[in-house]
């Protein structure tokens, strides 16, 4: 469907795929199952969890209350993970603000994997991407009109799923964030398939009647996904027995914690020893805004100048420090993978995508790679996943 665009995207891809063995595949599938139980519990019981743990504004709580009367349907969400120096996979964030983010861009990774497999005639690889496309095709149900409510954030994904859904016979309309309220009578009609590419700031700026219309029309994704699951403070809950004991078995909680980076909320008391140490030893920590994505606002100590790092502790006119709107994590040393791109050698770090829709997991999407330990802040390349047990094929891959 997107083969005409493939030559452009292929120029950014590593020559060697990332090989995923059956053991890694099963590890990631278990990780999804555990994560989904946490996400579902948080979404359905946030009123018991939020007080004292994840402060939300009155407007946010009002928005969530609109959605709380509906069954939880996660929509599209994407846990991302990095590869630690010891080879373990470590969750670093969950992206769930924008519909289908990473899903259709991973099509080019599928093309790249197919091209690579031509070296091995008669052999196959395992992939759930076709199942994912079938699931995405079924999402509109019987709707013939599709509306994308979109923020000013840059994304390449919309033009891809526009083509995908137009080929299914849907009329496709994009409505920018400043037109959403004025055109509510258009997109909120019964029978519309409405998806959100809005960020939290956009949504918080709308009146409650508009937000209620989004719930009534069944907009994808669920507000609980956008405001709770995407929030990096959710990661702090994974390390709290009071939370995990209500949705996970002890062995599953231990499994999740072994695959996650310890996280604390900077404005809370238990983070203060970390913050004091981070102020003096920046290279040992990374700071991330609660709700942003695409590495926006991320301050990795080793990549941040000393004066810029210290500025995060300086109070503004309202008395709040920039760091007070962030989470803090130990900076994770990562394994690098050698590659040659445009004649130059790099040691790239990997960031993997777990492609999830509702309660389903469709295995790994494309890998984002960079010679910097934080993606999206410098050079940016890609690698395709290749799932196989074949030792000869794996010998030609960078094995995860």
Where are these regions (language model features)?
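Preference for protein termini
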Residues: 1-400
């Amino acid at each position: 469907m997107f083969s005409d665009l493939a030559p452009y995207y292929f120029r950014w891809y590593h020559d060697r795929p990332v090989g995923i063995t059956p053991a890694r595949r099963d590890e990631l599938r278990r990780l999804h199952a555990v994560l989904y139980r946490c996400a579902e519990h948080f979404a359905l019981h946030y009123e018991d969890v939020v007080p004292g743990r994840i402060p939300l504004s009155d407007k946010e709580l009002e928005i969530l209350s609109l959605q709380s009367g509906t069954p939880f349907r996660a929509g599209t969400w994407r846990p991302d993970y990095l590869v630690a120096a010891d080879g373990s996979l470590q969750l670093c964030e969950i992206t769930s603000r924008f519909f289908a983010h990473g899903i259709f861009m991973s099509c080019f990774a599928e093309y790249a994997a197919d091209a690579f497999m031509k070296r091995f005639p008669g052999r196959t690889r395992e992939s759930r991407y076709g199942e994912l496309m079938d699931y995405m095709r079924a999402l509109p149900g019987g709707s013939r009109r599709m509306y994308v409510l979109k923020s000013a954030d840059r994304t390449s994904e919309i033009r891809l799923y526009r083509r995908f859904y137009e080929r299914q016979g849907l009329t496709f309309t994009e409505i920018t964030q400043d037109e959403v309220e004025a055109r509510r009578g258009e997109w909120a009609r019964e029978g519309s398939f409405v998806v959100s590419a809005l960020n939290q700031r956009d949504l918080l700026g709308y009146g409650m009647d508009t937000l209620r219309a989004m719930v009534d029309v069944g907009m994808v994704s669920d507000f609980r996904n956008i405001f709770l699951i995407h929030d990096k403070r959710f990661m702090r809950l994974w390390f709290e027995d009071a939370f995990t004991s209500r949705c996970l078995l002890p062995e599953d909680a231990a499994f999740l914690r072994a695959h996650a980076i310890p996280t604390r909320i900077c404005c809370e008391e238990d983070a203060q020893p970390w913050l004091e140490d981070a102020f003096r030893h920046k290279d040992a920590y990374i700071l991330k805004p609660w709700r942003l994505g695409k590495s926006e606002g991320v301050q990795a100590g080793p990549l941040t100048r000393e004066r810029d790092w210290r500025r995060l502790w300086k109070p503004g006119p309202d008395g709040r420090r920039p760091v007070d709107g962030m989470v803090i994590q130990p900076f994770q040393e990562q394994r690098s993978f050698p590659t040659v791109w445009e004649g130059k050698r790099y040691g790239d770090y990997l960031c993997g995508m777990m492609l999830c829709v509702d309660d389903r997991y469709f295995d790994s999407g494309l890998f984002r790679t960079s010679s910097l330990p934080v993606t999206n802040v410098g050079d940016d390349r890609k690698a395709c996943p290749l799932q196989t047990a074949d030792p000869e094929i794996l010998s030609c891959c960078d094995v995860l």
